[in-house]
Amino acid sequence: MKTKQQVVVVGLGRFGGNVARTLYQLGHDVMAIDIDEERVQTLMGEVTYPVAGDATQEAVLRELGVHNFDIGIVGIGANIEASIMVSVLFQTMNLPFIVARAHSALHGNTLRRLGCHRVIHAEEEMGSRLAHSLFNPDVEEYMELAEAFGVSRLQVPDRFTNMTLDEAGFASA
């Protein structure tokens, strides 16, 4: 994967806006598109190309050169129809990698069948992360890999500093 990617983010609510802003801060070229001019204005100077436009229109996306981008992210909020339309347009334009936010299991299944490479269930993922870290202050982050398996990033307690896993009692874990 190239170090600097060209990413288009459609839907600039809390989810899409934060994704666009963070990707730009990480050094990627980011085109951020939303039909709401005010949302676009809030990202001025925080993304490479802030654009007000209707991303459900193929002509708009083609005029913007979206077909030349490496990654397409569909962060559209509650409008499931628009989410599906943009996902199909990204697929039609042969974007190499498409990520879409789903609002339900059925919506997620639909996005996968449409060819989205990664489907995000933001609320479910955050709920799972909170549940795994709430009563364990050493858990900084949690990522579910499968239904019964996950990976945690832990803050190492001082008592384990300079110890091997075996010495700390984790050899069989």
Where are these regions (language model features)?
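Cytosolic regulatory regions of ion transport systems
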Residues: 1-173
